[in-house]
UniProtKB/Swiss-Prot annotation:
PROSITE patterns hit by this protein: RNASE_H_1 (PS50879)
Domain RNase H type-1: 20-162
NCBIfam families, A to Z: PRK00203.1
UniProt-recorded name of the protein: Ribonuclease H
Domain of life from the UniProt record: Bacteria
MF (Gene Ontology): magnesium ion binding; nucleic acid binding; RNA-DNA hybrid ribonuclease activity
Subunit field text: Monomer.
Encoding gene per record: rnhA
Gene Ontology biological-process entries: DNA replication, removal of RNA primer
InterPro entries, alphabetized: RNase_H (IPR050092), RNaseH-like_sf (IPR012337), RNaseH_domain (IPR002156), RNaseH_sf (IPR036397), RNaseHI (IPR022892)
Length: 173
């Protein structure tokens, strides 16, 4: 049985102009060698017969930051508003969008509740802004379950995390 969690998401007030001709599929993954530690992201974009792979990383970061950054980099690669299905094995990423957590954290001044700050507000801010430009469905896929594109993103993210030339993550303390 394939486990998925999917919901279309638009931050409140979003009015992105959509082109129904542009149906894009994005697979993302993030990895960290230690947590925190060197981290990387991997992205596979599919549009018709076109395929693009992206990867990168930072020398000290977290796995969750890399999961969010993978989604950001995938969406930033789109040149115009699209209908997007974004697949991720990160429940943190998918639930934060689909369940409205990220939007709620933003509305509450980047606080999860009265005592706790929301983590990664710099990345959530960027992701929410990108979500407002597209018609996006976030779908959770089980990691390491023989999903070809998810496995490719896993390889890309781990390779990126292992690079010797990684820079500092500007948003990580």
């Amino acid at each position: 049985m394939k486990a998925t969690s999917k919901a279309k998401t638009h931050p409140p007030g979003a009015t992105a102009a959509k082109d129904p001709q542009k149906q894009v599929i994005i697979y993302t993954d993030g990895a960290c060698l230690g947590n925190p530690g060197p981290g990387g992201y991997g992205v596979v974009l599919l549009y018709g017969e076109h395929r693009k792979e992206l990867s990168g990383g930072y020398r000290l970061t977290t796995n969750n930051r890399m999961e969010i950054l993978a989604a950001i980099k995938g969406l930033e690669a789109l040149k115009s508003a699209c209908s997007v299905t974004l697949y991720s094995d990160s429940q943190y990423l998918v639930n934060a969008i689909n369940k409205g957590w990220a939007q709620r954290w933003k509305a509450n001044g980047w606080k999860r509740n009265a005592r706790e700050k929301a983590l990664n507000p710099d990345l959530w801010e960027r992701l929410l802004e990108l979500c407002s430009r597209h018609d996006i469905t976030f779908v959770w896929v089980r990691g390491h379950a023989n999903n070809k594109e998810n496995e490719r993103c896993d390889v890309l993210s781990k390779e990126a995390a292992g690079r010797a030339d990684l820079k500092a993550d500007p948003g990580y303390p």
